Regions:
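C-terminal effector/catalytic modules and regulatory tails appended to multi-domain proteins
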Residues: 2-110, 332-335, 339, 343-488
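Acidic/polar, low-complexity linker and loop regions
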Residues: 95-108, 138-141, 148, 302-307
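Broad hydrophobic/π-residue packing in well-ordered secondary structure
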Residues: 121, 126-129, 183-185, 270, ...
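Short, well-ordered alpha-helical segments
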Residues: 133, 261, 265, 269, ...
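Divalent metal-dependent catalytic cores for phosphoryl transfer on phosphate-bearing substrates
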Residues: 161-357
Length: 488
């Protein structure tokens, strides 16, 4: 059974609990007809994930596109429905529409067509069309597990109380839109490689495909960056009125991200400019521009979507809380690795079987504990080189997590411990577990445990391990090896 089918079956098993949870939170008169888990979406999912074949989604790419835009539309419709400034809650004869989604779908189709070029343009480029759907699927499963425990606890801001369907809609827009800017970012790298190649026969080749903005475009981008980088404060002397204040750290970090053309910030700009839902946002930093409670709530909903998307490629923004959308996107985006092949993988005999095990979240402990687990089974071939590739990739991921979950101002308040666990089985007689531990009360470290067999001086694992961690010796008598690493 494919990983996609496993997660779909898990979601299916939890839908009844979700329905009960949702019904307990929202009265019958206020239940939206359209949302990301309505009957129409449930039927589309049932038609999409049927056989359990590993490549089923790639064989049904047109259906993936169809459900992608349906989910986007239903999410916007749901969010508009619960906006009390609009007429839909009071007048059920009126139905909200998702304006701008035709333009977004047109962009997404071009994105899909263009992706085939990117496979040949970068050795390590991997699918991002099916990927975003899988990220959504994994996130939905996490939100619905254990009687919707994570869905219940996830929040946006103290001034932004949202119901379960609004939370699902926010997650849907974040997960399905977070990589829209990827082709633009990658195209620049392809141009750089072409320019470098041309230097062999052309002196100072002139090729320019920088994403330059000028005039009004710069002003528009700056407005969106300020929108993402602000928060609301109660106006002095006014009980129910608020004013917006810029958060300079966020603003500078997102400016830096845009300067480097990272696809997260570009994706945020794309959806803000294409979807009327965002263009209708109320926002100003002027002191005399005030917001009431619903204005504030709607501002935070939109800011959460844009900020989460921008933050997932902005390592300068570190994470303090597990129960927010930004954390969930990073978790699901980094974890979704099943079924993704790069150009390099397609032309190399693969003696390594990869299995994604799960994302396990324990919300019953203090602090919360999050574990991302997968495994590699190596059969034949150059075992040492296979282990070396796995460990190098693990080290790269570890660096990403250590930066995102690094210590900084207010990190004493961090409410979670994080584990990234990889199980490596090079032969039938040996098995090793490599665990990146980032905890609230200790320095980050990597712990290697032999779960079957013994360490030995000349085996493939020891050689690969010493190549990745120079100076670290494996003690054959030990069952566990700890490697201290500095948070970056």
């Amino acid at each position: 059974m494919s990983t996609d089918k496993q997660y779909y079956d898990s979601i299916l098993a939890n839908l009844a609990n979700f329905d009960s949870y949702y019904n307990s939170k929202v009265t019958r008169k206020k239940r939206a007809n359209e949302h990301p888990l309505d009957d129409g979406i449930r039927q589309k999912l049932a038609d999409l994930i049927v056989t359990g074949k590993e490549n089923e989604l790639f064989e049904k790419l047109s259906m993936v596109q169809e459900i992608w835009i349906s989910l986007i539309k239903k999410s916007i419709i749901c969010l508009r429905y619960y906006d009390t400034r609009e007429p839909f809650l009071q007048n059920r004869s009126k139905t909200p529409l998702a304006y701008g989604t035709d333009s977004l779908l047109d962009y997404f189709k071009k994105y899909t067509d263009f992706e085939s070029l990117l496979y040949g343009g970068a050795n390590h480029y991997r699918d991002h069309v099916v990927h975003v759907f899988r990220v959504w699927l994994l996130g939905i499963d996490i939100l619905l597990r254990n009687n919707c425990q994570y869905l219940d606890k996830i929040k946006i801001d103290q001034y932004c109380l949202i119901n379960p369907l609004e939370k699902l809609s926010v997650w849907t827009l974040i997960s399905l839109s977070h990589d829209l800017g990827y082709p633009l970012e990658k195209s620049l790298q392809i141009v750089e490689k072409t320019r470098d190649m041309m230097k062999n026969f052309v002196t100072n080749p002139i090729m320019n495909m920088d994403i330059d903005f000028s005039g009004v475009q710069n002003n528009m981008n700056d407005f969106v960056l300020r929108f993402m980088s602000s928060k609301m404060h109660k106006k002095d002397g006014e009980h129910d009125l608020y004013v917006a204040r810029l958060q300079p750290k966020y603003y500078f970090k997102f400016q830096k991200s845009l300067e480097h053309n990272t696809h997260g910030i570009i994706s945020s700009l794309i959806i803000y400019k294409l979807l009327i839902f965002f263009m209708e946002s109320d926002y100003s930093l002027h002191e005399d521009y005030t917001f009431d409670k619903e204005d504030v709530r709607q501002y935070y909903i939109r800011r959460e979507i844009l900020r989460a998307i921008a933050s997932h490629t902005c390592p300068d923004v570190y994470q303090l809380n597990m129960c927010n959308m930004s954390y969930l996107l990073i978790l699901c985006d980094e974890s979704q690795d099943w079924g993704r092949k790069s150009l390099t993988n397609l032309y190399v005999d693969d003696n390594v079987k990869y299995t994604f095990k799960d994302v396990d979240i324990d919300m019953g402990s203090t602090p919360f504990v999050c574990k991302v687990q997968d495994s590699y089974n190596i059969s034949g071939g150059d075992v040492e080189q296979s282990i070396l590739r796995i460990l190098k990739r693990f080290l790269g991921q570890s660096k990403t997590y250590r930066i995102l979950f690094r210590d900084g101002q207010d990190t004493a308040k961090r409410d979670f411990d994080f584990h990234r666990i990889v199980e490596i089985e090079p032969t039938n007689s040996k098995r090793f577990e490599v665990d990146l531990k980032i905890t609230t009360n200790a320095q980050a470290q990597i712990v290697v445990t032999q779960t079957r067999g013994r360490f030995s001086e000349n085996d493939a694992f020891n050689k690969a391990f010493k190549a990745v961690f120079p100076g670290c010796e494996v003690d054959p008598a030990a069952k566990t090896l700890k490697v201290s690493i500095e948070s970056e």
